[in-house]
Curated annotation (Swiss-Prot):
Pfam families: A_deaminase
Cofactor(s) the record lists: Zn(2+)
Catalytic EC class: hydrolase
Binding-site residues, Zn(2+): 14, 16, 194, 275
Protein name: Adenine deaminase
Gene3D superfamilies noted in UniProt: Metal-dependent hydrolases
Residue sites binding substrate per the record: 276
Lineage, broadest ranks: Bacteria, Pseudomonadati, Pseudomonadota, Gammaproteobacteria, Pseudomonadales
Gene Ontology CC, one term: cytosol
InterPro entries assigned to the protein according to its UniProt record, in alphabetical order: A_deaminase_dom (IPR001365), ADE (IPR028892), Ado/ade_deaminase (IPR006330), Metal_Hydrolase (IPR032466)
Function statement: Catalyzes the hydrolytic deamination of adenine to hypoxanthine. Plays an important role in the purine salvage pathway and in nitrogen catabolism.
Active-site residue list: 197
Annotated positions for site Important for catalytic activity: 218
Originating species: Pseudomonas syringae pv. tomato (strain ATCC BAA-871 / DC3000)
Amino acid sequence: MYDWLNALPKAELHLHLEGSLEPELLFALAERNRIALPWNDVEALRKAYAFNNLQEFLDLYYRGADVLRTEQDFYDLTWAYLLRCKEQNVIHTEPFFDPQTHTDRGIAFEVVLAGITGALKDGKSKLGVDSGLILSFLRHLSEDEAEKTLDQALPFRDAFVAVGLDSSEMGHPPSKFQRVFDRARNEGFLTVAHAGEEGPPEYIWEALDLLKIQRIDHGVRAIEDERLMQRIIDEQIPLTVCPLSNTKLCVFDDMAQHNILDMLERGVKVTVNSDDPAYFGGYVTENFHALHTHLGMTEDQARRLAQNSLDARLVKP
C-alpha cells in the first residue's frame, strides 16, 4: 500500500519550510556557518523531538532555524524538501515561510526570499514540481510586527500567492490580525490561516469571517461545532489537515482517534499534509500511510483525499 500511496499524484498545502529541516542538514549548516549546537550529534537531536505540545515543539523549531543564515542555506533547505516532493509524487506544493523567524535574527528579508524562490524556480524546471509561496505571520508577535513584515514583502509581491497565520494559537485569536489581513487582501493576496488546531472552533469562525480566508489550516476542532461543520461543507472550504503532526503534538492522543476520515465522509474537503515533517516523523506519503495503518483508509478514500488537495490549490494549473 505504501508504494501505491507514494505513486498517487497529490499536492501539499500545509508545509513549513523551516519544519522540513532534517537533523543531518541542520548539523551540516551549523558546521558551514560555525554555529555551536546544544546537541552532540544527530541522534541526540532526534531524541529531543519527544515534545509534548505545540509550545515545546516551537521552542525547538526556532532553535533549529537559527542555523539558516545565508541565501545558499535557504536554497538548500527548500531544495531538499522539493526532492522529497519528487520522490513522493507531490506535483504541487504551497509552502509557508515565516520571515519574522529570520528577520528578528538579523537575516535580511531578501536573502531568505532569494534562496527559497531560487529553489522553487529550479524545482519547477528541473523536477517538475509546481509551487506557490505563502508568507506567514507569527501570531505570538504583534499585529504591528506583522504590518512591518507585509511592508517588507510588498516589493516582492509577485513572489507570493497568499499570506497566512501560524505559530502559538492559544491566546492569539485571528481577530488580533484583522487589520493586516484586510490590507493584504487589498494588495491582492489570497489569505489562509491556522485555526482550530489547539484553539477552539471560535477561532475558525473568526478566521473565516474576519480574515476572510480561502482555506483553513488544521481545522480539526471544527467537528465540535455542528453549525460550523455545516458551513464548511456547504461552502466547500478546504481544510489542510496534518495527521502525524496532530498526534505528535497531542491534538489527538493517537492516530486511531483522528477525525479526518469522519470529516471526509461527511463531505468536508479535507486534505493530507505533513506540516513540519522533519520534526513529526514523516512527509506526505507517511501521513497517508498512517491513515491506512491506523484508521483503515481505503484506496477510494486516499484518491478522494489526493484529489481534494489538487482541487484546493490556490495556484491553479
